[in-house]
Amino acid sequence: MTPEERELIVGLFGRLQQFENQPRDREVEALLAGLIARQPAAPFLLTQTVLVQSV
């Protein structure tokens, strides 16, 4: 990982942090948790996708 890639990832999660306390749909959270349990690479792939689309 390059320093630039690290900065992009940390920046993305910093932007997401502002929404951390907003209400979330429990059913959606449960579905996502189950899907991530079956596909553990999903957070990596989703992060990569978001960063590619935002550049």
What do the predicted segments below correspond to?
Residues 1-55:
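N-terminal leader-region detector that preferentially activates on the first domain or presequence
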